UniProtKB/Swiss-Prot annotation:
Expressed in green tissue, with high steady-state mRNA levels in leaves. Not expressed in roots. InterPro entries: PsbQ-like_dom_sf, PSII_PsbQ, PSII_PsbQ_pln. It comes from the Eukaryota. Keywords: Chloroplast, Membrane, Phosphoprotein, Photosynthesis, Photosystem II, Plastid, Thylakoid, Transit peptide. This is Oxygen-evolving enhancer protein 3-1, chloroplastic. Disulfide bonds: none annotated. The modification Phosphotyrosine is found at residue 209.
Amino acid sequence: MASMGGLHGASPAVLEGSLKINGSSRLNGSGRVAVAQRSRLVVRAQQSEETSRRSVIGLVAAGLAGGSFVQAVLADAISIKVGPPPAPSGGLPAGTDNSDQARDFALALKDRFYLQPLPPTEAAARAKESAKDIINVKPLIDRKAWPYVQNDLRSKASYLRYDLNTIISSKPKDEKKSLKDLTTKLFDTIDNLDYAAKKKSPSQAEKYYAETVSALNEVLAKLG
């Protein structure tokens, strides 16, 4: 109440002066806030400019370094001598053309050209060896080692089929038909023996093994 009374008793000039002082202090406070905000914006703008400037300088330096590296590589380029193609490779000591022959993958596996071609006389000798290996699967049948029976049959039958076709193609026309009939019968019995091994049937395997041996003997007798 005393303060209010003092205000009432104060002169208009005093009140006007106090209002001017208070108003100026408020204006000064708001001005400081604006200046602080502007300074923050200026600092952030300067930081972004510095970052972009550094990135541009880095890209230019990388481009110059890459260009100098390429020039150095081109300057030090050495010619490479290319020699002749390698010699034919294979499993035999004299080397074979087996790995260098074209393969017709559209054909069935048993007809596909993937074995080393031999003259008829050498093909006949290899056919006899393949026939012996097929006959030697009997102990595997007795032990019921069916996967091994199938592996040996398929491996040796592939060689035998290829060599018999070579021999038949070299025979006169009147001998070709009889040999073709015998080979067809032979491979039918081999397929039956393979199927018996797949079914793990000892009785069927014994039956078709005997038929295979008989057919092999007939074919070998024709070969001489």
